[in-house]
């Protein structure tokens, strides 16, 4: 991080789609619990590589792909779809501060908003980095930004600026196109967007490598690709000359490590 006062708040555990962990002899629920624990650990430990201390990292522990349903029924608990758990406190033991949902552990929208409001009041950020609500279609990403804005409506401390980013697009999950280390083109204009300013800080080769190593610390991005994807890449390499970085096989190593970043700047 280029800021000495960065704080990182992770909303969900990341426990679903844990088939790879079933190879360890675990059933679906146990594999999901293990993956959730590992990704929760990553959310607290990996930021240290970028100079963000654990005391400035918070894991809220809500469950993957449940945020949109939570938003529609704010007082109803929504358990994990795969792990069998329904208590967000299971991955909160290393958090640096107490939060409202620590009282009952219920995975509800009301608890999520209260947690986020408490975090905002504690860290008093001037800038919030959150997924772009119009560009990034991932349901949890859209709901995450909605939750952040609802929490801001309840806090005395008011962040002034949103930095918005997109990990996915509605019609193209290969964006940004091209190999790692290259630039990032603006995504296709499929529909009208708010007239936000752009901020595109550059990353030199050393920072790009540091970012790649930060990605490599994430358990979810480790391991070999499935055979089908390996064969597809071999064909693409031979016929289209495509290349993937040596830093990691997951697509994020190609998409996320570029010579500059791209953020949409929205004033509140």
Where are these regions (language model features)?
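Active-site rim/loop-helix segments in enzyme catalytic domains that contact anionic ligands
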Residues: 1-123, 145-159, 168, 214-217, ...
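Active-site environment of divalent metal-dependent phosphoester hydrolases
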Residues: 15-18, 133-141, 172
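Active-site rim elements
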Residues: 30-33, 132-135, 195-204
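Short, well-ordered beta-to-alpha junction loops that form the rim of enzyme active sites
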Residues: 60-63, 130-134
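Structural motif
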Residues: 126-127
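Histidine/acidic-residue-rich catalytic or RNA/ligand-binding cores of hydrolases
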Residues: 141-144, 148, 174-180
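Active-site segments of SGNH/GDSL-like serine hydrolases
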Residues: 164-175
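A conserved mid-domain beta-alpha-beta active-site/ligand-binding segment of alpha/beta enzyme cores
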Residues: 175-238
